[in-house]
């Protein structure tokens, strides 16, 4: 009898196993029969390689979305499957609700392998290294402890105010300097002039990262076999470029980290991401390995934070030059709230809703990361009758989301009032652009609260002290900025350099600015 039962059980297992295999085969075949999402016509072998937009790709993707009547479009670049999501609803469904399979990162040959950014937090696949660095971020930059960094943000912003007063402003140089000393202090605890030796290298390294991080920027990303070409081969100039950019990355990662450790050892340090993380290391685990993780988290913090705030504040200045009435309205509210001789502080946020609305519109109108950083689909999936192949690069079109007429009526004009109620208070029913400005799903930027508050305090402080005016030529005529934006492949959307003037609003404002020299 027991033998008979065993035979029945074995037969039952065989039947169940066979049934499961059949179901799997049927499901796989049904997936294979499902169509890919719509998109431009694909050519043999190269797919849409010739259709890929070289710059401002988010505009083309939004155009294709309208042309094909679909929130999701599909492209193929020499065999690489690319999915572009063009609505908040679809991004929420896939990147949020199905984040388990949509949270990894596509590995770009140029950026990750040749330039060495593969283990950087923002670019790493979902693996133990990424999880460990995420834990470092969450502990060291916890939003509940945001006030710990307010002093650093105010110090850097006050230095920016003083530097803008020194003479004809090279705005972009000053903004890069402001962002650098701010992020160096928050990340490494390196302050003021001590940060100067690291700034130039960091700016160059971040520029190279922004270029190489844009899908389609280098042919080697579509045809990885090209990475084996000797550097001297015609057409292999990208390898020399990658080698030079890799050196910049290493300098950017190593030098300030070593300096931060020296400060901590000597006891002459202020709280920072690095100091907080080093204090939290597990003494029973490999210390060298933990330090490498902290170093990787730190360089990512510097990279993501610096470019984000520079792009946003330069976009704010350009918007003010194009809309002087917005500047006047913001300054009227500042004058109502601030006492004589006062500069804005973080305690004034609730009292300055127009400044907050202005920052929201800066983030919405020309988002800093219009396509975020591409995700990777780690398993086959389906959506609305379409097959979404495993291994696809998945891009969320933040620009399209932030220009959705159903969410932001009449989205093209720059208009901070869209975020305000008739009584001048913030309209909480209008979706906050920050929800689409700092990544999606499990890849949401852990330092977004610091970036947002840094942008806010700089905007409020500049408007409290200065009138932003157009540059004048030798004949005294105003020079109207072109308002052009960088048109090449890039992760970060930023305006091209333009000239302007920062004129103190009054003698009292000028006195405040001059007094800041002794405090920075």
Curated annotation (Swiss-Prot):
Cofactor(s) listed: heme
GO MF, any single term: iron ion binding
Record's bilayer topology term: Single-pass membrane protein
Main localization, broad class: membrane
Any one Gene Ontology cellular component term annotated for this protein: membrane
Annotated transmembrane regions: 7-27
Associated pathway: Secondary metabolite biosynthesis
Residues involved in heme binding: 445
Record localization: Membrane
Family annotation (InterPro entries): Cyt_P450, Cyt_P450_CS, Cyt_P450_E_grp-I, Cyt_P450_sf, Cytochrome_P450_fung
EC numbers: 1.-.-.-
Keyword entries, A-Z: Heme, Iron, Membrane, Metal-binding, Monooxygenase, Oxidoreductase, Transmembrane, Transmembrane helix
Function: Cytochrome P450 monooxygenase that is able to use pyrene, phenanthrene, 3,5-dimethoxy-trans-stilbene and 3,5,4'-trimethoxy-trans-stilbene as substrates for oxidation.
Family note: Belongs to the cytochrome P450 family.
Protein name: Cytochrome P450 monooxygenase 98
Organism in which the protein naturally occurs: Postia placenta (strain ATCC 44394 / Madison 698-R)
Lineage of the species this protein comes from: Eukaryota, Fungi, Dikarya, Basidiomycota, Agaricomycotina
């Amino acid at each position: 009898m027991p033998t008979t039962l065993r035979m029945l059980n074995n037969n039952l297992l065989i039947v169940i196993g066979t049934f499961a295999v059949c179901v799997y085969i049927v499901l796989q075949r049904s997936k294979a029969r499902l169509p890919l999402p719509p998109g431009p016509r694909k050519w043999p072998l190269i797919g849409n390689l010739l259709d890929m937009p070289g710059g401002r790709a988010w505009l083309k993707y939004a155009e294709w979305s309208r042309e094909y009547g679909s929130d999701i479009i599909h492209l193929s670049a020499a065999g690489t499957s690319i999915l572009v999501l063009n609505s908040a609803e679809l991004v929420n469904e896939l990147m949020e609700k199905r984040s388990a399979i949509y949270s990894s990162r596509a590995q770009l040959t140029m950026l990750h392998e040749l330039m060495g950014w593969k283990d950087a937090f923002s670019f790493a696949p979902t693996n133990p290294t990424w999880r460990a660095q995420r834990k470092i971020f969450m502990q060291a930059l916890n939003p509940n402890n945001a006030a710990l960094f307010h002093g650093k943000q105010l110090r850097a912003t006050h230095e920016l105010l003083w530097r803008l007063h020194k003479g004809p402003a090279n705005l972009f140089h000053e903004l890069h300097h402001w962002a650098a000393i701010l992020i160096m202090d928050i990340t490494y605890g390196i302050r003021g002039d001590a940060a100067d030796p690291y700034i130039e290298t960091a700016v160059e390294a971040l520029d190279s990262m922004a270029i190489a991080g844009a899908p389609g920027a280098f042919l080697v990303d579509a045809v990885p076999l090209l990475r084996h070409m000797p550097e001297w081969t015609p057409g292999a100039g990208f390898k020399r470029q990658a080698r030079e950019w890799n050196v910049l990355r290493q300098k950017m990662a190593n030098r300030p980290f070593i300096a931060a450790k020296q400060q901590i050892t000597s006891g002459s340090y202020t709280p920072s991401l690095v100091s907080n993380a080093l204090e939290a290391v597990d003494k029973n685990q490999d210390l060298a390995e933990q330090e490498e993780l902290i170093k990787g988290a730190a360089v990512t913090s510097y990279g993501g934070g610096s470019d984000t705030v520079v792009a946003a504040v330069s976009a704010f200045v350009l918007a003010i030059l194009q809309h002087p009435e917005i500047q006047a309205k913001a300054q009227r509210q500042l004058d109502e709230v601030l006492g004589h001789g006062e500069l804005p502080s973080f305690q004034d946020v609730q009292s300055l809703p127009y400044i907050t609305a202005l920052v929201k519109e800066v983030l919405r109108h020309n988002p800093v990361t219009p396509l975020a950083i591409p995700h990777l689909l780690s398993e086959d999936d389906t959506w609305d009758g379409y097959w979404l192949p495993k291994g696809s690069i998945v891009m969320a079109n933040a620009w399209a989301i932030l220009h959705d007429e159903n969410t932001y009526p009449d989205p093209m004009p720059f208009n901070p009032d869209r975020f305000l109620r008739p009584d001048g208070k913030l309209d909480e029913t209008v979706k906050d652009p920050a929800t689409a400005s700092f990544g999606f799903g499990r890849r949401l930027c852990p330092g977004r609260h610091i970036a947002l508050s840094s942008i806010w305090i700089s905007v409020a402080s500049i408007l409290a002290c200065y009138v932003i005016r157009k540059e004048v030529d030798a004949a005294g005529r105003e020079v109207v900025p072109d308002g052009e934006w960088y048109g090449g492949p890039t992760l970060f959307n930023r305006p091209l350099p333009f000239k302007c003037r920062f004129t103190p609003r009054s003698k009292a404002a000028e006195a405040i600015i001059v007094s800041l020299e002794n405090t920075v």
